[in-house]
Each structure stands twice: as C-alpha cells, then as structure tokens.
Amino acid sequence: VIDRLNRYYVERKVQPYAPYAASQLAGAEMDEARSRLAAIMGVATEELSFGPSTTQNTYVLAQAFRQFMKPGEAIIVTNQDHEANTGPWRRLADEGIEIREWAINPQTGHLDTADLETLLDENVRLVCFPHCSNVVGELNPVTEITALAHAAGAFVCVDGVSYAPHGLPNVGELGPDIYLFSAYKTYGPHQGIMVIRRELGALLPNQAHYFNADVLYKRFTPAGPDHAQIAASAGMADYISALAHHHGGPETEGAEQGAFVHDLMRAHEVALLQPLLDMVKDRNDVRLLG
C-alpha cells in the first residue's frame, strides 16, 4: 500500500484519464483497485465506490434517501451499531422520516430477528445494522436479516467496519443492498469503501456532479475522489493475494481467493482467542457477551 501510494505521488500525480502516459497510468491504477476489490467481494466493478470515510459515505447515502423517501416512511436502526451507521440515519427524523430502533437484548447484547419482524411493515424502506458490533463483538446473520427485510419490501445497509478487517466478505453472496467498511482499518489507506448494488444505486438520486450521474460508482461521490489513495487501495488486494499464495490457497484472484483468506484469518483468530475463553468461561465474576 505504501509503495503504491508513494509511486502515485512521485510518478502519477496528475489528473487521471487524460491522453498522456502518466495520466493513463494514474487512471489504470485507480481502476485496478476498484476492479480487484470488487472481484474479491463478489460484486460488479461499478458497484464499488470510494469516499473519504465510512461516516462520510453514510452521510451521502442519508442525503440520497432523504430525497428518495416520503415523510412518514421509516428506517430501522439498531443500538448495537457503529455510530457511522446510526447517527446519519437518525438525523433524518428532522425531515419527517420515522426512525425505529431495533434494540439489543440488554443481558446478551444480541439482536433478535423476532424483534426485527415486529418492526417491519410496508412503511419501512431501509434496515441498517452492523455485520459485527464494535461494542460486543456480536456477529449478525446478514443473509437471514437481509431476507427478512427484502421480504417486507425494504432495502438493507450493512456496516462492515468491524468485520472487514477479519477478512473481506463476499457481499454478492450475503445479499445486502449496501455494504460499508473502512480501508484504513483493513490494511489500506484512509478511504471508506462502499458497495451499492446496481438496482438501488439507479433508484437513489444522484449526489455527484450532474455529468457523473450515469456512472454508478461516481453517483455517490460528491467531490473529486482522492486519486492517490484509491490507487493505493490495490495494495489491499496485493496483501490478500500474498496471504493466499503463502498458505497454499487459490492462485487466481477473486471471490474464491478472498473466501480462502477470510477463513484463514478466522481460524487463526479462533485459535489465538480460545485459550482466553477457556480460562474465563467458568468464572463466576465474568460474563461473556457477543
């Protein structure tokens, strides 16, 4: 990542996509980052966008939904969330949008899907929740929750900030309409990465310059992107590929290789943590959550 960032600043620090060598290379490196990360996450290249941070990306999305929704329609958020995926949505209450809170069980920190079902009705347009809570470490069943929301006619926005560092997920298989995470917490530069599925991205109002309205990955980037940091994000794919090759995983980049590294990281984390869990699980003065 650092080598790519340094090379961009030293050799490519020009406006990308112009008809001369340095500019063409600059654009190619930005495209490389987007296409390789999208392939790992099982989505189309155009469905992956970059922005300054996950919080900033969510604020842009909230503005799009503010224009898209009618007063009286509802958004479901949780009290288990990273602030980036709750604060921007809650502020839409000032615009007449109803905010419904899917609350955790205070004894376990768990989000019960039965409680979600009681909140869902024809007025709910969006359900927001974390893939993994940054407070209690709870892993939420994204596919199951997404299916419930979709059956009720709602879209789904998943905050993956606390999950992605443990292995990039296959968003295409999980099924949410939006998936957000932070590159700088996932072996990358200071960027927010946002997957928006094509169907929803086309429905939401354009938030970018009018001349970018027809390009999905530009529609939710209001300002000029950080060219160098986007290009450097390809280093995240380099790292995943290097891990796969070192541990005998798939040679070809893409979702299969990403899944191998995801499972590799998960197994290593479990092995490291299990002795601690074994030590504390029988203690009367410690209660495990998540």
Predicted features and spans:
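Pyridoxal 5′-phosphate
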Residues: 1-290
